[in-house]
Amino acid sequence: MDIIKTLEDEQLRENKFDFHVGDTVKVDYLIKEGNKERVQVYEGTVIKMQGTGLRRTFTVRRLAYGVGVERTFLINSPRVTNVRLVREGKVRRSKLFYLRHREGKAAKVKEKQKF
């Protein structure tokens, strides 16, 4: 058995977040400022998921004052307290880097219809 794999399995977080590329999510992120702690909510579209196990990351993109901002989070980070699904997106790609070059309505992802 691989030693690194066994160590990672011990530290994996129990509550898995259920979201995919193209979904719009709200990420609750713990921020320390001096001796204070607060939770900052970051909402955007998941454009990339990468890695496996303990090193799994996802990148969220949003527009802030007309400028595209991307932020990468570790799924198993203790600073990521919660990831809430706002809406499911209908995409056929694993990486949505083409959204970086689009503006306005063209940068939106269609919503997945549930029947």
From Swiss-Prot:
Pfam families, sorted: Ribosomal_L19 (PF01245)
SUPFAM superfamilies registered for this protein in UniProt: Translation proteins SH3-like domain
InterPro entries per the UniProt record, alphabetical: Ribosomal_bL19, Ribosomal_bL19_CS, Ribosomal_bL19_sf, Translation_prot_SH3-like_sf
GO molecular function: structural constituent of ribosome
Disulfide bond sites: none
A single GO BP: translation
Any one GO CC term of the record: cytosolic large ribosomal subunit
Origin superkingdom: Bacteria
Protein keywords: Ribonucleoprotein, Ribosomal protein
Record-stated family: Belongs to the bacterial ribosomal protein bL19 family.
Protein function: This protein is located at the 30S-50S ribosomal subunit interface and may play a role in the structure and function of the aminoacyl-tRNA binding site.
Listed HAMAP family: Ribosomal_bL19 (MF_00402)
NCBIfam families: rplS_bact (TIGR01024)
Protein name from the UniProt record: Large ribosomal subunit protein bL19
Gene: rplS
